[in-house]
């Protein structure tokens, strides 16, 4: 069967593979486009397997939202260079939108989610790996499904936040999401802080006190320690932090002034918790040139 340009074009549109790869797939499969697509998927998976042990610590946080339903996904690449590649960026958007329209609650469940093209996210991942030449990982997925006020915010593709408010408007929700992106509070309010953390901080503050202060009456000593602990708790809670969009008030004051309440939030940052491999510049250039 003759391998026409239109047949190659159709296979490229279906699979996202390169022109020469599509032509080879069609030749190998006697012009059968379905068999050629399957051949490309298998080829992509084989290439992906060879790269699976490489550390992927760069990447992008992508988001998708429809009303009170919102998701964040973290997709990792090996280098910042590929993290800016149009094929990679398009893939992260595909993953985010597929996640939004699925019931998946984690990255593992996302692998088998089918796209409009009929392929799974895992199969698309393998195809993109074949194009960009790096290990890619769909590492994390977080979502909020709520009838409340929900905002999704991504800063520079590196940090993403989902926040849920009861009450307030879209502007407030986005402002709170921006604050969380910037300040990374571990907890919403003081009652969320573990008692073990508070006890440990009290122990530390007491150990730091001078003998003169320790000799003060118990009630005075308790006030001093309580003041220090209150400051620490404010630093680790969203409500206790000065609001980045108006530092004259705390986040709690800003939220309550709008008659709202923060129900919860999720925050992802690219590569957090992944041990990166340090390489020299020459090695990085060689890798990008396909020489390493």
Swiss-Prot record:
Q: Name one GO molecular function term.
A: translation elongation factor activity
Q: By its UniProt entry, which Pfam families does this protein fall under?
A: EF_TS
Subcellular location, record wording: Cytoplasm
Coiled-coil blocks: none
Please give the chief subcellular localization of this protein.
cytoplasm
Region Involved in Mg(2+) ion dislocation from EF-Tu: list its residue ranges.
79-82
Under the heading Gene3D superfamilies, the entry gives:
1.10.286.20, DNA helicase RuvA subunit, C-terminal domain, Elongation factor Ts, dimerisation domain
User: Which InterPro entries does its entry note?
Assistant: EF-Ts_dimer_sf, Transl_elong_EFTs/EF1B, Transl_elong_EFTs/EF1B_dimer, Transl_elong_Ts_CS, UBA-like_sf
Q: Which GO terms describe its biological process?
A: translational elongation
Superkingdom classification of source:
Bacteria
Query: Is-annotated flag, keyword Cytoplasm?
Result: yes
- What GO terms fall under cellular component here? cytoplasm
Keyword vocabulary terms for this entry? Cytoplasm, Elongation factor, Protein biosynthesis
Q: What does this protein do?
A: Associates with the EF-Tu.GDP complex and induces the exchange of GDP to GTP. It remains bound to the aminoacyl-tRNA.EF-Tu.GTP complex up to the GTP hydrolysis stage on the ribosome.
What NCBIfam families does UniProt report for this protein, alphabetically? tsf
Q: Which family does it belong to?
A: Belongs to the EF-Ts family.
Protein's name according to its UniProt entry: Elongation factor Ts
What gene, per UniProt, encodes this protein? tsf
